[in-house]
A protein has these predicted regions:
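Beta-strand-enriched, solvent-exposed domains that form extended recognition/catalytic surfaces
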Residues: 1-6
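Hydrophobic beta-strand positions that form the internal "hydrophobic ladder"
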Residues: 10, 88-89, 135, 317, ...
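Beta-propeller domains
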Residues: 14-75, 79-113
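Short loop/turn segments that connect beta-strands within beta-propeller blades
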Residues: 26-30, 101-104, 150, 204, ...
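Repeat-based blade/solenoid architectures
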Residues: 62-69, 233-246, 297-305, 345-358, ...
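Acidic, serine/threonine- and glycine-rich low-complexity intrinsically disordered segments
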Residues: 108-324, 329
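Loop/turn-rich, solvent-exposed surfaces of beta-rich toroidal or solenoidal domains
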Residues: 301-379
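Blade-level signature of beta-propeller repeat domains, shared across WD40, Kelch, NHL, RCC1
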Residues: 360, 365-437
């Protein structure tokens, strides 16, 4: 297989004289270079990845006033009947733009995908949740607009309705979605403004594995866009929140016994400036919060939050507080104290993660953490979990610098100007459950 050099790697979004500019750090696979042991204690020789090549300011003049960048993953074919669709990059700026994931060329401006006229009062998007079956965007007025796709293998088939979702209901947040299987993945989460409650937006859409037809069959999409209330005992933890708020919430889906349920991890902040980590999963079309777990982060009280990176297979997050990096686990049934793993001289601007997951026969790969600092420098670290107990709790954590390195420094300095955001671009949704070195 010939892979585009931009299909996977680290994306750095910079503000260059007010304009959105992308840089790209490429992956290089090193074959048979390291020896380790797998989970059965057997010695294995395995491949590794390195970051030697960087293309700085590769894509210029995308637009003005950059705010962030995220990845829109395409349809991951399981059995090969429908072709796997890779990804797009969406640059959040004054005029949002969507880029081809393999070439980084512009595909469309987001606003051009509306039926007819733009919404009354204009369209200024601030957040989005995009999957291969539907796209949802929240604007600065708190309205969410929905784009339903008729087929699984086209990012731009269909269009946004110019009438806001659910009779002009206002939302104060819209959270990322991760959909890489037809089953058990039918939800986008949003925060309803009037009562500060987390709700579900249906995100249906499935294709027949026995056919090469990419069209979604009707009974899987008829409820897309419907607002559903959480149910069950643990729903109260996200309803009518008065003494706390959701600082951020990110996808945390993991393959548990093959069930592939959607999952999220939320960083909560109390009115007293305390923090708490909450994790939960959701069963398809059963709106109970499942496997709910919370962990108080006492060490982080009164600190200034910057960003959070999730390592979903390994079930921990790294949280940036000012110039500090904190490692926090979410192991069900176990209290885990945050661990300070690094302090920089400069403030952290943004984080992203590459949580490499392969089958156990290859041994465990360390997660990789991308860190951007306010001085324009960018680093990639391996997160080394040491002294792990049978319960899953880790006693010691270190980080090891992977980038910049001796090879990459031959191509220039490690300064990307005014960094706005960073992202590990996975390229293909199948990589979530089985990383391809």
């Amino acid at each position: 297989m010939v892979r585009s050099p931009y299909q996977r790697g680290w994306v750095v979004l910079s503000d260059v004289d007010g304009k959105s500019t992308l840089s790209f750090i490429k992956i290089k696979t090193l074959y048979g270079v390291s020896e380790t042991v797998n989970i059965w204690g057997e010695k294995v020789v395995r491949d590794s990845i390195a970051y030697h090549s960087v293309e700085k300011y590769l894509v210029k003049d995308l637009g003005t006033n950059p705010k962030g960048v995220f990845e829109h993953l395409g349809y991951p074919s399981t059995f090969g009947q429908v072709e796997t669709v890779y990804d797009e990059l969406v640059v959040m700026q004054d005029r949002w733009v969507e880029l081809n994931g393999n070439t980084l060329e512009r595909e469309v401006y987001t606003e051009d995908e509306f039926y007819g006229d733009l919404p009354v009062g204009g369209f200024k998007p601030v957040e989005a949740a995009m999957s291969y079956s539907a796209k949802f965007i929240r604007d600065e007025n708190g309205y969410i607009y929905m784009h339903t796709k008729p087929v699984a293998n086209d990012f731009h088939a269909g269009a946004y309705m110019s009438i806001p979702l659910w009779n002009y209901t206002k939302f104060s947040a819209l959270y990322p979605v991760q959909k890489f299987k037809d089953r058990n993945m039918d939800a986008v989460l949003a925060l309803r403004e009037e009562d500060n409650s987390l709700v579900i937006i249906r995100n249906g859409g499935g294709v027949k594995n026995s056919s090469n037809d990419p069209t979604f069959y009707d009974n899987t999409v008829k409820d897309t866009g419907e607002i559903v209330e959480f149910e069950g005992e643990d729903a109260k933890n996200f309803q009518n929140m008065r003494d706390e708020s959701i600082v951020t919430m990110k996808t945390a889906s993991v393959n548990v016994n093959g069930d592939m349920m959607q999952a999220w991890v939320a960083l909560m902040k109390g009115n007293d400036m305390s923090y708490q980590l909450r994790y939960f999963r959701m069963k398809n079309k059963k709106w109970d919060i499942y496997d709910y777990y919370e962990n108080d982060l006492t060490s982080l009280k009164n600190k200034e939050y910057t960003d959070m990176a999730v390592f979903e297979q390994k079930q921990y997050v790294v949280i940036a507080m000012g110039n500090e990096l904190w490692y926090c686990q979410y192991v069900k049934g176990m209290a885990s104290a945050p661990k300070l793993i690094h302090t920089f001289d400069k403030k952290v601007i943004a984080l992203s993660s590459n949580d490499i997951y392969l089958y156990p026969k290859y041994g465990v790969y360390n997660g990789q953490l991308g860190v951007a600092l306010e001085d324009g420098s960018f680093f990639i670290y391996g997160v080394e979990e040491k002294d792990k107990q049978e319960s899953g709790l880790v006693n010691d954590v270190k980080i090891k610098q992977l980038y910049p390195n001796e090879e990459s420094e031959k191509e220039g300095d490690n300064n990307f100007g005014k960094i706005v955001d960073v992202l590990y671009k996975i390229g293909n949704a199948n990589q979530i459950v089985q990383y391809d070195l």
